[in-house]
Amino acid sequence: PVVGSPSVLHTQAVASSLMDVASGRLLSQENGDKELRIASLTKIMTAIVAIENGKLDEVVTVSPGAAGKEGSSLYLKAGEKIKLVDLLYGLMLRSGNDAATAIAEHVGGSVEGFAYLMNLKAEELGMEHSRFANPSGLDQEGHYSSANDLARLASYALHNDTFRSIVRTKVKTAPNPNEKWEYKWINKNKMLLQYEGADGVKTGYTKKALRCLVSSATRNGQQLVAVTLNDRNDWQDHRRLLDYGFEKYPLETVIKKGETVAGYPFVT
């Protein structure tokens, strides 16, 4: 629900969005419904669909197609066996396209089958400006989303304990059956180190999508999520967006007990 019209904090992004996670209130947006390439922000959808449809302790066998997937990688080997939960950490911390493909094949039966599940979830969440064709976010026709849709998706996913725990993790180790040492994955999301209260969510880049970022932070019991698409100055813009949200819309102003939201009484 949107209470009044969201204001606009200008950024260097082609599109941006800022949302209160608990209420779903849109606090700021610029070109928020513009359909754009989203690179690895796709993996937010991949993760939540896998969490909801798979079993975290199941063992996934990595296919040759997954192991050979181009782009950012965990360097998984064909035939390697790894738990779904560990793949999810590799997916969200290191943006492994091999992990995304292995997850999709395991949970959806195929990349196409998993994309079907992704689009079902998008429809369920009212993501009217989104379409998913693959689990990694590699540039492909018919694969896009919008800043507002991604804010809605991230807010939904952050209500899931498993998802929330993964995306706030700075460093994760996991068993590596092929070597004498463990996998060690360091989260690419610099906001976790640079911004007070930061607790998620995902970076993204392709040559066509350029720099994309979804971040979240919690202060004084209030969690906000910020989205920028095609933004060369994304780290600074996210600090500005989140600062703006916490300062202009502290928790008590986002929703007051008994207040009507979009025509409906809000029950606390």
What are these regions (language model features)?
Residues 127-128, 139-144, 148-268:
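Domain-terminus/edge residues, biased toward the C-terminal soluble/receptor-binding domains
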